[in-house]
């Protein structure tokens, strides 16, 4: 029997919603929130009644009867580290989302709003593969400095979705494949997927791995320390140089990779150097992950917005095809990925996990 799901994906200035019947999209909407509307609230949690009302009003305008829903799936927020999968929203999760235990982010509202609507309909609410998915093997956590442990923050939802898609298209289960997945968007994450777990991945938020349109990636540590103590920058300014104002935008003044590629291929040497350096760093990170998988790699999957670039994907392929075949799944579809996570539970393919 077909299942109907409402998907809620809150961002800082908008809330994306979608209604699906199984994997078929019935409709989707991006509900934009002005700075004035958001500015009324002193923190993210306070926005939840406002955003919930906007969602319900749009569903009403569309003439959609929410009583026909079987489940609601929200974007997973900044929770305590968890293994990948679909989690039923429970009291422990709601408490951590409300209190922003790992930080404030609009995605914290996905589970809260989903639960509130689901409760009134007596149906389950889920979250799927939040950014805090942490399946690193113990050896991967060692950094070389006891005070600092490597942690896992990356594009878990899209990484897991395309890995499962690759497995399905090759008539295998996700638990039976070894692949390297490369997400190239505003940030870059390269993950080693082994038997259904991402056993190593760069921290895509916090200055590790390849640079990206607006993040620095890993930089020489001694020089960074000296920059921190140069007296020229505050703590917040240094953090912004790592995440937000680093990478391509720091070198070229733009975070639009289409513009970077256009100018590079039109003969601008500086743009070409930065574009090729991005390709070089991504390829090097793929090589590292292939070693983590001990050379046993079924495929290298390129995904995210930058994977639409023929030049970038071709150049990466030229560098890494000796490791494994390269597969392209450009872009990302978070609404569908969240839907699929909910359906796996509703169809009995897997059990909902419990957040503790």
Curated annotation (Swiss-Prot):
Top-level taxon of the source organism: Bacteria
Keyword Secreted assigned: no
One of the Pfam families matching this protein, by short name: Acetate_kinase
Gene Ontology molecular-function annotations: acetate kinase activity; ATP binding; butyrate kinase activity
UniProt KW keywords: ATP-binding, Cytoplasm, Kinase, Nucleotide-binding, Transferase
The EC number(s) this enzyme carries: 2.7.2.7
Gene3D superfamilies assigned to the protein according to its UniProt record, in alphabetical order: 3.30.420.40
Main localization category: cytoplasm
GO biological process, one term: butyrate metabolic process
Pathway involvement of the protein, from the record: Lipid metabolism; butanoate metabolism
An example Gene Ontology CC term for this record: cytoplasm
Record has 4Fe-4S as a keyword: no
Catalytically driven reaction(s): butanoate + ATP = butanoyl phosphate + ADP
Leading EC class: transferase
Compartmental location: Cytoplasm
NCBIfam families assigned: butyr_kinase, PRK03011.1-5
Stated family: Belongs to the acetokinase family.
Function: Catalyzes the conversion of butyryl-CoA through butyryl phosphate to butyrate.
HAMAP family (alphabetical): Butyrate_kinase
Name of the protein: Butyrate kinase
Gene responsible for this protein: buk
């Amino acid at each position: 029997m077909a299942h109907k799901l409402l998907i809620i994906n809150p961002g800082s200035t908008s809330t994306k919603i979608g209604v699906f019947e199984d994997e078929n999209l019935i409709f989707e909407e991006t509900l934009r929130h002005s700075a004035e509307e958001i500015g009324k609230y002193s923190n993210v949690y306070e926005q939840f009644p406002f955003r919930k009302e906007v969602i319900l009003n749009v569903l009403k305008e569309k003439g959609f009867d929410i009583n026909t829903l079987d489940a609601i799936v929200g974007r997973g927020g900044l929770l305590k580290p968890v293994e990948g999968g679909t989690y039923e929203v429970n009291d422990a999760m709601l408490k951590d989302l409300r209190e922003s235990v790992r930080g404030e982010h609009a995605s914290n509202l996905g589970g809260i709003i989903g639960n509130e609507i689901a409760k009134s309909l007596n149906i389950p609410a889920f979250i799927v593969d939040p950014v805090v998915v942490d399946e690193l093997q113990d050896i991967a956590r060692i950094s070389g400095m006891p005070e600092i442990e490597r942690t896992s923050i990356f594009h878990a939802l899209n990484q897991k979705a395309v890995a499962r898609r690759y497995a399905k298209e090759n008539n295998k289960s996700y638990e039976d494949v070894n692949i390297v997945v490369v997400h190239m968007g505003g940030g870059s994450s390269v993950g080693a997927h082994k038997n259904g777990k991402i056993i190593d991945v760069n921290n895509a938020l916090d200055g590790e791995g390849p640079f990206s349109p607006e993040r620095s990636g890993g930089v020489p540590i001694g020089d960074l320390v000296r920059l921190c103590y140069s007296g020229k920058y505050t703590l917040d300014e240094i953090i912004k140089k790592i995440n937000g104002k680093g990478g391509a935008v720091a070198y070229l003044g733009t975070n639009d990779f289409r513009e970077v590629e256009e100018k590079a291929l039109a003969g601008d040497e500086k743009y070409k150097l930065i574009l090729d350096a991005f390709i070089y760093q991504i390829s090097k990170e793929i090589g590292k992950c292939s070693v983590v998988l001990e050379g046993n790699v079924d495929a290298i999957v390129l995904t995210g917005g930058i994977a639409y670039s023929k030049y970038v994907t071709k150049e990466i392929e030229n560098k890494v095809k000796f490791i494994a075949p390269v597969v392209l799944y450009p872009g990302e579809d978070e609404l569908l990925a969240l839907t699929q996570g909910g359906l796996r539970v509703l169809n009995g393919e897997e059990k909902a996990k419990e957040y503790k």
